[in-house]
Amino acid sequence: MVDDPPTDVILYVRGALFDMDGVLVDSTASDERCWLRWAQLHGMEGSFSIHSPHGRRAVDTVRALRPDLDPYVELRRLEDFDAEDPSGTSALSGAAALLAALPTRSWVIVTSAPARLAKTRLQFAGITVPHNLVSVDDVSRGKPDPEPYELGARKLGLEPSECLVIEDSPAGIKAGKAAGCKTLAVYPRTRSIRWWRPIGSFHR
């Protein structure tokens, strides 16, 4: 049973570590299009679930689904699919304004996407590419391993315990908590996790 979230929560932190897809940017349509196109290419459309890749590195998903393929070749293919047609990608309401209101060096985007893809999606969604970005290219182990969020904290010159992670996927939430960060889940997909709070926009 999931505990009801408290009505008001005050967290004292010095830095914010934002996941990208599903938190700042809604890339669901683009993601589905790319993964389904990839699944069709490899004759997997009948057995593929679009929910399985969410929050994890594409190379890890490819390894799990098709260990016979070179995951880095397939990663590049997926990037190309997305670059060809990023339509449907948009910023979550209020996300750009929130980021603009924060001191530039007080926050980091920590994403399971490659840097090239992350920048494409942010630009298409109208969000300025940040000074600090941790992508899959920067780590040897992706979420749910804590390495991405540990690196995000280091980029701010902070301890993980001084940072708030904002996440929407179970893998990302586990990564934030394992890193020792305060961790906030912001999407109903995570109702199986004990910490969650639904959010439709960043205006409140």
Over which residues does each language-model region extend?
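Asp-based, Mg2+/Mn2+-dependent phosphohydrolase catalytic module
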Residues: M1-R14, A96, A100, A115-R204
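Short linear interaction motif-like sites in intrinsically disordered regions of transcription factors
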Residues: L36-A39, V108, W196-R197
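N-terminal helical cap/lid subdomain that shapes the substrate entry/recognition surface
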Residues: D4-P103, P114-R116, I127
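Short phosphate-binding/catalytic loops that engage adenosine nucleotides
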Residues: R105-W107, C181
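Conserved SAM-binding loop
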Residues: L24, H51, W107-V110, R141, ...
